Amino acid sequence: MSCQPFTSADTFIPLNSESSATLPLIMHHSAAECLPASNHATNVMSTATGLHYSVPSCHYGNQPSTYGVMAGSLTPCLYKFPDHTLSHGFPPMYQPLLPEDPTAADFKQELRRKSKLVEEPIDMDSPEIRELEKFPNEFKVRRIKLGYTQTNVGEALAAVHGSEFSQTTICRFENLQLSFKNACKLKAILSKWLEEAEQVGALYNEKVGANERKRKRRTTISIAAKDALERHFGEQNKPSSQEILRMAEELNLEKEVVRVWFCNRRQREKRVKTSLNQSLFTISKEHLECR
């Protein structure tokens, strides 16, 4: 097909008109816009009756390919768009269709900031790292001093913070086998637990100490009271509870003091008898050897 340049605008006859069946389709382009026929145009030429010229594919002139929405998937047009519609009809695709949401912008900035923080290397000589390396050993010593095992600590933390804490977690923390992030998180929790445990332990030791001081308090028994107790012991070395109460009232002593005195007196009597029997046995044995 030879191309003839025209200065006027392009003219065309649509294929769906009544005269398209008898008249050939004549399209005129400028010499610079002539393109080889496409496969689609060849198919149209073979199927249309009375069409004796190959039809060139649609050419959008200077229009970028991004302007045509799904241009690659659409069938080529059989006419040429005017230049003014191609250059002024559509906005550039690289411009945002909607204004950017400020919330989304803030989210992106926060995401970039967090990614930078993660990528920053950890200073191994920082005071935080040194404290994190020293605390596990200190925690272990104080935990053992309070009488708690790793299992006790894991169960106590699991009851408050969930099942993610266990004996294995405490063991790995004390052996410096956790990641930096998890170790920092667990250090804060264990510090608080240790303070509470030491407070409870201090209260318990205070109560136990008071009970021990009360138990170790000794009662002084007068000589007259001892003589009276010795006489009662000679008569009955195992008095009943009523007899002990009566003796305590007579001697102006506590019932527990009288009861303990009789217990100690029986033990001393038993030791004396045992020692005496051993002495007699030794004497008898020596006497037999002399014979």
Swiss-Prot record:
GO terms for molecular function: DNA-binding transcription factor activity, RNA polymerase II-specific; RNA polymerase II cis-regulatory region sequence-specific DNA binding. SMART domains: HOX, POU. A motif (9aaTAD) lies at residues 5-13. It holds the Pfam family Pou. The keyword DNA-binding applies. Keywords: Activator, DNA-binding, Homeobox, Nucleus, Transcription, Transcription regulation. PROSITE patterns: HOMEOBOX_1, HOMEOBOX_2, POU_1, POU_2, POU_3. GO terms for biological process: positive regulation of transcription by RNA polymerase II; regulation of transcription by RNA polymerase II. One of its GO terms (cellular component) is nucleus. It is found in: Nucleus. Residues 214-273 bind DNA. Residues 124-198 form the POU-specific domain. The 9aaTAD motif is a transactivation domain present in a large number of yeast and animal transcription factors. Transcription factor involved in the specification of the lactotrope, somatotrope, and thyrotrope phenotypes in the developing anterior pituitary. Activates growth hormone and prolactin genes. Specifically binds to the consensus sequence 5'-TAAAT-3'. Belongs to the POU transcription factor family. Class-1 subfamily. Interacts with PITX1. Interacts with LHX3. Interacts with ELK1. This is Pituitary-specific positive transcription factor 1. The lineage of its organism: Eukaryota, Metazoa, Chordata, Craniata, Vertebrata.
